[in-house]
């Protein structure tokens, strides 16, 4: 087999067979296939797509490219929740502690920032001392002891995806349905969780801009997960504006902590309660109404916050900053963005907000970039709010002043102001089982 022939075949819109897919995944993971050929194939897949059978074969090849975990030593049912990526999406930092506090084991492997979206691992690393690179044996011990751990993708786990993930990030091939499905599910299926709930984002801040594309993504992931013997569910949720008010790394951790203390933004709190309820329901803790009440109670009685403290301490982090968020490192510089005119914020290009955060240093433009954990933005006004001309709509934060102008311009160009308030959009648009 030759990589050239596989690239040509997909470039011309033909269907790749299972052996071809396994061959190029194994070849790329072992270093025999160079980046430039894999980048060409990713672009061919981006334009020509893959059918469900090809995507399932790619997913299983990614899963089988390295070690497959055995979580049988972890007592009880094991669950995972995964988001397809959004702006200001810190839900895992809230949902995982809620679920774990209610007796369901959370053994979660998360990713780093991809494109304009932030990654859970980058966010957690803004906590002083927090370790995300933990050996599998220790990971299982932590989950057994505390009921929860969130770690970075193990180097031995789906190594093909780790390489593809970094390559897609810098070659404009992130938002491809088969590449997203195989990346997410390849990793998820290499781990040994019993139940997986997927938070599939739709709208301007997601990789899937339309509800139709998001539903297709959800249906394919649920189907491939079921083929692998997992209990699956997907929620299609709105990403036409950031979740909560904070976008960035430490800024989002602080907002997640405040949510667990019962002081979070209403949209973030509601979405986290709904996601938690679906996970608990899939884990047979009760019907959805009962599970929703349990999730709210876990926030109200402080048990979910305590579970986050347990996780941070279990992974070597300084839990003092969870109990007192003033201890997080602050950005050296800030800049207030003012409304250019009066009216209602009728909508935003959420991806533009994510790009503004990137320009401030909160994400990566190349694989080697170092993230400024303090960088990002805090919204003062959101979609549906009325603003007066000259009133603050956001505050930008960064360790360098040089990114402020570009970030401010990007944020303003992504904000639409009109004279009529927009209709309200539900947080959850559909459930796929």
Predicted feature descriptions by range:
Residues 5, 10, 15-17, 68-69, ...:
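Well-ordered secondary-structure scaffolds
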Residues 77-100, 104-116:
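Glycine/serine-rich anion-binding loops at beta->alpha junctions
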Residues 144-195:
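Phosphate/diphosphate-binding glycine-rich loops and adjacent basic-rich segments that engage nucleotide
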Residues 1-88, 307-314, 428, 433:
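Acidic, glycine/proline-rich low-complexity segments that act as flexible tails and inter-domain linkers
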Residues 47-48, 93-107, 187-192, 227-228, ...:
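Alpha-helix C-terminal capping segments
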Residues 109, 143, 151-154, 184, ...:
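Short beta-strand segments
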Residues 59-83, 136-166:
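Self-splicing inteins and homing endonuclease
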Residues 123-149, 219-225, 229:
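A glycine-rich helix N-cap at a beta->alpha junction
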């Amino acid at each position: 087999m030759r990589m050239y022939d596989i690239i040509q075949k997909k470039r011309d819109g033909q269907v790749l067979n299972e052996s071809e897919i396994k061959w190029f995944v194994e070849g790329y993971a072992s270093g025999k296939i160079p980046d430039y050929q894999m980048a060409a194939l990713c672009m061919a897949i981006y334009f020509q797509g893959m059918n469900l059978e090809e995507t399932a074969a790619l997913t299983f090849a990614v899963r089988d490219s390295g070690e497959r975990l055995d979580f049988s030593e972890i007592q009880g049912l094991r669950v995972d929740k995964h988001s397809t990526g959004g702006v200001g999406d810190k839900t895992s930092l809230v949902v995982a502690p809620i679920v774990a506090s209610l007796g369901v084991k959370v053994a979660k492997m998360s990713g780093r920032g991809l494109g304009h979206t932030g990654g859970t691992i980058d966010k957690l690393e803004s906590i002083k001392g927090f370790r995300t690179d933990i050996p599998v044996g220790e990971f299982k011990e932590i989950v057994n002891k505390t009921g929860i751990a969130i770690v970075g993708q193990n180097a031995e786990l789906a190594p093909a995806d780790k390489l593809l993930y970094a390559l897609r990030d810098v070659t404009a091939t992130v938002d491809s349905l088969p590449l997203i499905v195989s990346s997410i599910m390849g990793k998820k299926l290499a781990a040994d969780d019993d139940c997986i709930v997927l938070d599939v984002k739709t709208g301007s801040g997601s990789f899937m801009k339309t509800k139709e594309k998001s539903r297709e993504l959800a249906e394919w992931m649920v189907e491939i997960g079921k083929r692998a013997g997992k209990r699956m569910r997907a929620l299609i949720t709105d990403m036409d504006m950031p979740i909560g008010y904070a976008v960035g790394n430490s800024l989002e951790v602080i907002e997640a902590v405040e949510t667990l203390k019962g002081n979070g933004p209403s949209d973030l709190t509601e979405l986290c309660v709904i996601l938690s309820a679906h996970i608990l329901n899939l884990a047979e803790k009760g019907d959805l109404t009962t599970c929703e009440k349990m999730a709210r109670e876990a926030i109200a009685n402080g048990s979910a916050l305590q579970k986050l403290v347990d996780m941070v301490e279990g992974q070597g982090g300084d839990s003092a900053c969870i109990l007192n968020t003033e201890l997080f490192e602050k950005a050296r510089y800030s800049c207030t963005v003012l409304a250019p005119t009066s009216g209602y914020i009728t909508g935003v290009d959420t991806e533009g907000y994510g790009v503004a955060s990137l320009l401030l240093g909160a994400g990566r433009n190349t694989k080697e970039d170092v993230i400024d954990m303090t960088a990002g933005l805090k919204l003062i006004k959101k979609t549906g709010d009325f603003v007066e001309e000259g009133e603050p709509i956001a505050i930008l934060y960064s360790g360098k002043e040089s990114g402020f102008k570009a970030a401010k311009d990007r944020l303003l160009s992504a904000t639409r102001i009109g004279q009529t308030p927009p209709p309200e959009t539900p947080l959850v648009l559909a459930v796929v089982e």
